[in-house]
Every structure is written in C-alpha cells, then in structure tokens.
Amino acid sequence: MIVNLIERIYGFLWGDLLQIPLPGGGSVGISLLIILLIPAGIYFTIRTRGLPIRLFPDMVVALTGKKDDNNSLSTFQTLIVSTATRVGMGNLVGVVAAVSAGGAGAVFWMWVTALIGSSTAFIEATLAQMHKERDPLYGGFRGGPAYYIHDYIEGRTGKKKNHVLVSVLFAVSGLICWCGISQVISNSVAASFENAFSIPPLYTTIVLVILAAVIVLRKNATVKVLDLMVPFMAVCYFFITIFIIVTNIGSLPGVFVRIIQEAFGARQVVAGGFGAVLMNGVKRGLFSNEAGSGSAPCAAAAAECDKPVKAGFTQALGVFIDTIVICSCTAMIMLLVPEKLLAGKEGMDLLQTAMKYHLGEFGVIFIAVTLFLFSFSTFLGILFYARSNVAYLFGDNWASQTAYKVLALVMLFIGGIAAYTFVWDLGDVGIGLMTIFNTVILYLMGGQALRELKKYEAARKEQKKKN
C-alpha cells in the first residue's frame, strides 16, 4: 500500500508530464521537476549575469570569513556540512544510476544542471542567510526555506502567524526526503560491504547505526566530526581518480567524445532515448548537488557572515565541487572501463567492478570504505538540516529533536534490508516535493537576493576606486 503510494507520487513528480515528438518516431519526456528546475537555473544565471563563472574568485574568497560566536558556524564550516550531504550517495550510487539508465550522455546533463544550478543555489542560500534567526537549542543561527517562505507569506498577508501551510509542507517533505536518504545510505553501504568483505548486510547495518547514534545523539558533535571527515574523504577520492585517469590517459579523449555524442547523438534522438539521457542526468544531478531543492539553505542559514551573499557564494561553490569535480570522478572511473565488463551489472556492484578493473582487489575495498565515509557524512549532514525543520514544526524542545534523530536511525536500520528501487523512490519523492515548494518561492523572493548581490558588487566597485 505505502510502496504503491510512493511509486504513484514518484511518477507524478519524475514521470513524463509532457511528450515532445522527435524525428524517427521517438519522443522526449519532460517531467514536472525539469520544467521547474531548468528554467529557474537559466533565469537566475541570466539575472546574476553568469555568476558561477563571473564571480568564481569571490566564491573562493568567501570561505575565509571569520566568526565571532563560538556556537555559530563559519562559511567554511557550512560548506563542509552541505558538502557532506552533496558529496555522498549521489556522487557514487547516483552517478552509477544515471549512467546505467541514461548512458554516458547523462554525465553531460549533470554538468549542465550543476552550472546553471549554481545560480539557483546562490539565490536560495542568500535568502536563507537574510531570513535566519537565533537557535536557542544548539546556539548560533538556523533557517532555511521553511523560514523564508514563512516570512514572505507573513509579509504578503500582513498577519503574524505561528505556522504557514507552505512552510509546513516544505518541512514535512524535507523530513520525508531525509528519511528516504537514510534508507539509501544503509542499503548501499550494506551491499558494498557484502561484495567487498562478504559481511552480511544485517551486521554492517547494526554497526552503522551504532556509530551514527553515538554522534548524532550528542548536542554539537556533528559539525566537529564533519570538519575532519569531509576534507579527508574528498581529497582521497579525488587523487585516486587522478591516478586512474593518468594510467588510462590514452582512453580519456574517447570518453569525452562518448559523453558528448550520447548527450546529443542522433542515435539517442532517433531511438527515443534522448529523454532517458536528459532525465537521468538532471535527476541525479539534482539528487547529488541539491541546487533548488532547499536542503543546503538549512546549512547556509547557520553561517555567521557580514554579507548574506557570502553564504550564497559558498553554496554555489559547493555545487561546483560536488558535480563538476566529485561526480565527474565517479563518471571517469566507470567510463574508462570497457563496456562489456560492466554489462548486466547495476548499483554498487557496477562501481566495484569498475574499481576492481582499475586497482584490483584494493579498488573493491577502497570504494567500499569510501562509500561508508561518504554515506556516514551524508547521514550526519541531513540530520543537521533536519534541526531547523523539526524546530519549525514542533517548536524549541529537545523531545522533538531527539525523536526525529531516533526515527532517522530506525530508517537507517530498515534501509539495510529494504528493496533497492523503493528506497531510491522515497528519497526522490521527498526531494521532488521540496523542490516544488522551494523553486516556486524562489521566483517570488529571488529579487531580494539579487538586490543583495547588486549592493555587494557596488560596494566592491567603490572599494576598488578607493584603492
């Protein structure tokens, strides 16, 4: 019953809302979320005058911001938290799923989603910083879409409200999404460890839940652990990929040719496969970099910075790191393997086969450990996101905060034995609903963030004149 309901909602969000006929009898299926996300990304890229490229140096400089309150987070720490969730399941299992279903061309559309999505990420993170509030439970600040949606509707109606329906729907969708992701985490880690070490999934899941509980049930341990874990795991994965690319440098041009050909190739269009290529690239790009979904603003709001746009710059950079760098690493690992060796494989089995081809048994062990670290950091990150949404729904009390953490731990356990397709669908449903509520409000509130960007650039220009 529940599985059927999830599948029906998934079909509405991610299924083909429009069918565009193509030469040769095929068609391109366009989902509701693509209709929302792609125009939003293009619109904000135009309105910010190509911010991801034009202001890339400012994104890097924004990471050097200092903080005065020990309970608040620096811009760099909020990047770490958001990167923990971005550089996680989507970068490994998500890329595998995209390429398996949509071919190499899906990688190109993941890149496009990231480039235009960076502008969307800037807008939503800047809004979160502008509408943040003090957090009486954890200290520092909190916020996110539930909060800026609330402020917008209060401002429009002129009435003070305890809760706003759209904010409530967003917060509930977020909690559903993060429960779904919790299941994906244990499901994928358990399968990976079974393939690499022949450890029964139940044992792996139990250990994962215990380790997570030790950290998340403590007040402020999450950020401290992520500060150490995320840079280490990302750098290790990046350099292993560089080694693989260097040792297969002769095949690299062919990989890029294949990506471009399958992204636009006549074979895909005539066969009607272009829709699958586009859909899987965009869908997994969103699941990985979260631009427009409203997740990362929950971290952006926690930053202590002198200008709201700096929080926006930080999250725009996070999208670049996630998709252009880390997701590309996974894609290269897969696409540098002869296609016949990967035939008939899916999920982590496919990725581990690719790593075994490149690095032997060490590759299988490395990707299993990497998946564990990526997944563990993702779980910690999504529970950080959940804080502000739980507080919005249930108020400032430790009972509700602890209850959701326990629920997420239960979902983490259940995911180890759940069906692979169902747990992905649950996560996709949650992130899809979040994206609908958030993207619509971004069109309405985006002008606020754009005005902050204009003020920032005017001040920078004035400062240059003085110097």
In which residue ranges do the predicted regions lie?
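N-terminal alpha-helical transmembrane segments of multi-pass membrane transport
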Residues: 1-89, 99-106, 117, 443-467
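Membrane-interface loop-to-helix entry segments
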Residues: 36, 47, 51-60, 166, ...
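Helix-loop-helix module between adjacent transmembrane segments
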Residues: 40-45, 116-141, 150-187, 191-215, ...
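Transmembrane helix-loop junctions in multi-pass membrane proteins
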Residues: 47-52, 91-95, 178-190, 213-225, ...
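Flexible loop linkers connecting adjacent transmembrane helices
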Residues: 50-75, 97, 103-104, 119-161, ...
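Selective recognition of specific alpha-helical transmembrane segments in multi-pass small-molecule
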Residues: 116-124, 204-219, 230-250, 283-286, ...
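Extracellular/periplasmic helix-exit of transmembrane alpha-helices
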Residues: 124-136, 242-258, 272, 302-305, ...
